[in-house]
Structures are given as C-alpha cells and as structure tokens.
C-alpha cells in the first residue's frame, strides 16, 4: 500500500462481518490491503524482540490452521481484542480452508494493538512447509503467487519465543539440545528462514515424549523429542515454572506433561474435519494461575467446514498418545 493509508478499522470490521454467517463464507480483501497488513506487521515484528517478554494477564492459543470460524469462536469466548491480551503460538496457515482470513485478522490485530496482541512463529510459517500444505495453493487460487511471497517475507520476521513474567516459557514446538542460554534466542537475526536443524528449528519442531530419557529421534523426521527430566532441568536452570507449547493435536485441547511442568495447547477443534478433538485457550491471570477455556468440537452436521478443506487429503499432524485416532497413514508433519 505504497503511499496509501491502511484502513485498519474497515479491514477488521469486514473480516468480522461474517460472524454468524454459515462457516466457510470468504472475506476477499484487496491485494493491496493484504500487502499493507504484511508490510506494516513485519515492521512491528522487527521493532519488537525475537524473544518477547510479556506480562500477565493474557490468553494463550495454540494451532489455528486456517480454521477461521473457530478463530472467531475463540475470540467470542475470550473477548475480542482489546478486551483481552493474546499470545498465539504459531501455525496460523495450512490445512484449513481459510488461511487467508485467519492470518489477515491476526496481522490486523497485531498492527492495531501492538503491545497487547502477540504472534509467535510456528513451523508452518515457513515457505517450504506452507508451499505444500495448503497456504500456497490458497494464495494462488484467490490472489497470486507474488502475494504468497509477501507473506513469506512477513513470516521470516516473526518472534519465536516468549517469556511471561519471567516464569512461563512459550514457543511453538519445544526445547532444543542447543539451548543453554536465552541470549542464544535473542541473537537469532531476522529476517530468517527456518533451518533444517539447530536451535531455531527445534523451537518450532521438537516434541515432548514421556517414553524418552533425555533426547530422542522425532518421528516427524525433523528435530528431536525430549523427556520429562529435560523439562525439569530446563525449568530449574532458568528459574521458570512452566513451558507452554502447541504443535500437536491433543484430544481435550490441552494436555499436561512431566508432572504439569509442560502444557500442550491446540486451538483448532475437529482438526481438519478428521479428528474429534476439542480446542482450548489458556488464560493466565495476574497471579500466573492458569485455567483453560475449551472449544468443544462443533456439530459436524451443522458445521461441515473441516471436511474436504484445503489439504484434507494431506498427512495430518500426529495426535499425542492416540495412535488409534490417526486417520491416515502418511508422512508426519
């Protein structure tokens, strides 16, 4: 939007207009509006640290994956910004039918409320992944490939971790064997792609595994798994109380690990129309007490929005501790 002013309030109200409509109705912003959202939010991401230091109270959400009407349900439940402060843990795009609406609303809120609304990078905010799992195809179908590249430039500037009141460590994936000091995260220079290995890769890709002692191989073929004592040591070393991460489907929308020292959050109910999982949002109050708000899976007859979505025939993020729930064999991403 060179020279043009971004009409943020108008963009937000158009994106919210479909509340109450039958899920699946698109909001077609102009290409220059979307470009403006990417460019302005990118400037804000770069003006703020790559390791955010945030204060409670706030609400934390896990993967959304283009399930736009569920994102609206989350806000209806938690309060539309600026009623509540939010931290999202990444994976805004791919899989669901409406990645564009989802990411555009999140970027618009980031620009409107830069000190109260925060977005971390997930492993799907990466060109090599969202080229394959639906976002590229959605951009190409509804706009053009150039716009997808504009999003890539924006995603390459997202922060990758946050610490809430010096006690809760948040990232999309998990811990890294390379992570000894928080300074290492602060030293990551942006813009950056997500490498195939190393600290940044692990923060976005690793998973906890109760059956592993120390570090293990990850079934995803990327990064590592880590056991309960890795969590305990990390928290003790950095004087933290909790790790909060996303990245895996969990049946109830949230799941504790390592004696409640780590929690996984997942905020896309009925993920891809192939799971009966709930979605959840974690509220952290001023005293750092955590509570969970649950989005039950919607009635499939009433809301058939997941079935047949972009990428519904592609392999799905594997659920934790629920091999029976896996809908299809295939690569695990």
From Swiss-Prot:
Binds 2 manganese ions per subunit. One of its GO terms (molecular function) is metal ion binding. Belongs to the PPP phosphatase family. PP-1 subfamily. Mn(2+) 1 binds at residues 63, 65, 91. GO terms for biological process: cell division; chromatin organization; meiotic cell cycle. Keywords: Cell cycle, Cell division, Chromatin regulator, Cytoplasm, Developmental protein, Hydrolase, Manganese, Meiosis, Metal-binding, Mitosis, Nucleus, Protein phosphatase. This is Serine/threonine-protein phosphatase PP1-beta. Residues 306-333 are annotated as: Disordered. The active site is at residue 124. Mn(2+) 2 binds at residues 63, 91, 123, 172, 247. Interacts with lab-1; the interaction is direct. Interacts with knl-1; the interaction is direct. One of its GO terms (cellular component) is cytoplasm. Serine/threonine-protein phosphatase essential for chromosomal dynamics during meiosis and mitosis. Antagonizes the function of air-2 in the regulation of chromosome cohesion. Dephosphorylates histone H3 at 'Ser-10'. Also involved in the activation of chloride channel clh-3 during cell swelling and meiotic maturation. Essential for embryogenesis. It holds the Pfam family STPPase_N. It is found in: Cytoplasm; Nucleus. Signal peptide: none annotated. It catalyses: O-phospho-L-seryl-[protein] + H2O = L-seryl-[protein] + phosphate; O-phospho-L-threonyl-[protein] + H2O = L-threonyl-[protein] + phosphate. SUPFAM superfamilies: Metallo-dependent phosphatases. Gene3D superfamilies: 3.60.21.10. It comes from Caenorhabditis briggsae. Its cofactor is Mn(2+). CDD domains: MPP_PP1_PPKL (cd07414). It is an enzyme of class 3 (hydrolase). Its EC number is 3.1.3.16. Its main location: cytoplasm. Residues 322-333 have a biased composition (Low complexity).
